Each structure stands twice: as structure tokens, then as C-alpha cells.
A protein has these predicted regions:
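Short loop/edge segments at beta-strand edges and connector loops
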Residues: 21, 106-108
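N-terminal lobe of the biotin/lipoate ligase/transferase fold
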Residues: 1-98, 252-255
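Long, positively charged amphipathic alpha-helical accessory segments at protein N-termini or as interdomain linkers
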Residues: 1-3, 78-82, 86-104, 114-255
Length: 255
């Protein structure tokens, strides 16, 4: 569990690199920095989070020194910010594939899977009117299967559990930041983001369930459109578009 090395100066995204031992949440820390005027590309990484969180208010926990928990401040125009959730999931996939030679898929909108188990998640907290967002990423790097909480052992993965070998966290961090830096200039091309996402779409063709207006509905996922919405054909034959902010998705068995 060797700690990440401090990185004085600027990182590959052009902003300062903030390395913390322990924090409640890297997203909270980064948000405070953003409100205080921290520049684009500021990276906050912590060895341990005590109150990390994911989408829909879910918690994110990982043993100290086993995962990467980081947040990045980006200052971009509104249209680019809209593409962040899908693009950052693609970036995380590419980084995992580069350092661990794994086959990653994305459960819309931005959970990263290996063999249908979650290895990473992305949480975007955006302020479009102010022109900035915080990109939070949690990646299970070196967590052993037995180190996951019992309730997650059937659904969680790490690069170590997927490959049966250790992955260097420094290399994983370098790959993550490099892929984020590569995608940020391309965000205003919704088609480029959608195309890259479709190549790794874990739900395309799957039966899914979701909740809308308090009612559970089911249907078949048919990929995403160029705006990043999930296209679904309901069991009643209706074509609907689902936006990430208004639904909760879960896979269901066919039949």
C-alpha cells in the first residue's frame, strides 16, 4: 500500500496537483477550491476518503491505499460540460485498458464494468452558469476480492481481481489524467463522445428496469443518441429517451 508520490507543480491538465492523506470527499474539497477560484485542471487526489459518494447519493468506500479517489476541476462552456458524464466514463475505460489490458464496458451513464462488475464510477458536479464542474472518479485498483464489503462482493471488481495481478496506482493515475486531458478538447463534439461510448455500451440490447414518476417500467435498451440519452423501447412498444438525472437503472434478467 505504497502512498502516491507528491507531485509539485502542474499536472497534465495544466493545473496544480493537490495530494491529501485523508479527506471526507475529494469532490467536496475540489468544489471548495473551485468556488475560491482554483484554475482549470486542478487535481485533488486522496489516499483515503471518509465520506466518499457516488451517483444518486450512494456512498463510495475503498480500503486506504487500494483505490484511486480523485477529483478534477474543469472550466468549460456549458455545451462541453453536458458531455462530461459519458466522455469521462470512456476516459476511465481507456485508462484501465491501457494499464491492465482489461476489457471494460460502461453501464449508462458512467459506471465502468469489467465482466458485469463495477470497477469504477464517475460523479460530475457541474455549475454550468458559472462555467465549471468537478469530475470525481473512484477506481478500484488493488483491492482484493475479500476486501470488498460483503454486500458488494458479487457486484464489485478491481483491476487486481480482474487480472489476478497487481496494478501500479501511479501508472493508473498517470493513465487516467492522460485520457482526461485527451478528451477535454473533444467535448463539444457530441457525436465523437457518443461514438466512443457506443463501442463500450454494456446495456445495448439488454432488458432493463427503471423508475419514472414513481412507477417501475421495463423495456429493452437500444443504445444512446448523439445527446447522450439512453434510448429504450418499453414493453408496450413505446420509444422513450432517458436522461441520467431523472432515472435509476438496473439490469433485469430476460424473460
Amino acid at each position: 500500500m505504497r502512498p502516491l508520490r507528491p507531485r509539485p507543480g502542474t499536472g497534465p491538465l495544466g493545473g496544480p496537483f493537490v495530494h491529501l492523506g485523508v479527506t471526507s470527499s475529494t469532490n467536496d474539497h475540489a468544489r471548495e477550491l473551485a468556488l475560491a477560484g482554483a484554475p482549470h485542471g486542478t487535481v485533488v487526489v486522496s489516499e483515503q476518503q471518509t465520506a466518499g459518494r457516488g451517483r444518486q447519493g450512494r456512498s463510495w468506500s475503498a480500503p486506504p491505499g487500494r483505490a484511486l479517489t480523485l477529483s478534477v476541476i474543469v472550466r468549460l462552456p456549458g455545451p462541453a460540460l453536458e458531455q462530461l458524464p459519458l466522455a469521462m466514463a470512456v476516459a476511465v475505460c481507456e485508462a484501465c485498458e491501457a494499464v491492465a489490458a482489461v476489457n471494460c464496458r460502461i453501464k449508462w451513464p458512467n459506471d465502468v464494468w469489467i465482466d458485469a462488475r463495477k470497477v469504477a464510477g464517475v460523479l460530475i458536479e457541474a455549475r454550468p452558469l458559472d462555467g465549471w464542474a468537478v469530475i470525481g472518479i473512484g477506481l478500484n485498483v488493488d483491492t482484493a476480492p475479500g476486501e470488498f464489503p460483503p454486500e458488494l462482493r458479487d457486484t464489485a471488481a478491481s483491476l487486481r481481481s480482474a487480472t489476478d495481478r497487481a496494478t501500479d496506482r501511479e501508472a493508473a493515475l498517470d493513465a487516467l489524467l492522460a485520457r482526461l486531458a485527451a478528451w477535454l478538447p473533444r467535448l463539444e463534439s457530441g457525436r465523437a463522445v457518443a461514438t466512443a461510448f457506443r463501442e463500450r455500451d454494456a446495456l445495448d440490447g439488454e432488458r432493463i428496469a427503471w423508475t419514472a414518476a414513481g412507477a417501475r417500467q421495463t423495456g429493452e435498451a437500444r443504445g444512446i443518441d448523439d445527446d447522450g440519452a439512453l434510448v429504450v423501447f418499453t414493453d408496450a412498444g413505446e420509444r422513450v429517451r432517458l436522461d441520467a438525472g431523472e432515472v435509476h437503472l438496473e439490469r433485469t434478467p430476460a424473460g
